[in-house]
């Protein structure tokens, strides 16, 4: 029994009786997720490369307040995928993209909140790289 058949059977047995399970055809196992990178230092680019290496993601947008970092990341990303991501100097314009599935936030601890909250306002899926350490001042 295939995955699709199993899901349809499960929906029918749980009381959600219909001739066709709604939403099952919309979820493709070959889906490619469009990612927007926020924070173009080495950590952000390396996390993004991991996403791209799965074959299920591509970078469509890049934002960093430091233009030189964004341009460097754009060149590096273009070398590992077919199409170059668009560079943005306005975070809100990047979030306005309808095709943006995931916002990958890899910025310093001090800046994470503003980028996270703004992505929430735009109802985006978020992957945030959180540092797991405390500075000497926080101890």
Could you say what each language-model-derived stretch is?
Residues 1-7:
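Bacterial N-terminal signal peptides that target proteins for export
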Residues 10-13, 19-80:
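N-terminal Rossmann-like dinucleotide-binding module
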Residues 54, 97-98:
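Acidic-histidine catalytic/liganding microenvironments
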Residues 60, 85, 99-101:
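Conserved acidic residues
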Residues 84-90:
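Conserved SAM-binding strand-loop segment of SAM-dependent methyltransferases
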Residues 102, 108-109, 113-139:
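Beta-strand-loop-alpha-helix segment that lines the small-molecule cofactor/substrate pocket
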């Amino acid at each position: 029994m295939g995955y699709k058949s199993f899901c349809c059977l499960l929906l029918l047995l749980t009381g959600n009786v219909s001739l066709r399970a709604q939403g099952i055809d919309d979820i493709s196992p070959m889906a490619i997720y469009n990612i927007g990178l926020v924070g173009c230092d080495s950590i952000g680019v390396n996390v993004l490369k991991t996403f791209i290496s799965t074959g299920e993601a591509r970078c469509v947008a890049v934002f960093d307040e430091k233009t030189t970092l964004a341009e460097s990341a754009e060149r590096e990303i273009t070398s590992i995928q077919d199409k170059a991501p668009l560079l943005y100097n306005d975070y809100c314009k990047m979030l306005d993209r309808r095709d943006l599935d995931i916002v990958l936030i890899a910025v310093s601890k001090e800046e994470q909140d503003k980028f996270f909250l703004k992505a929430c306002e735009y109802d985006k899926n978020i992957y945030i790289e959180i540092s797991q350490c405390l500075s000497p001042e926080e101890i």
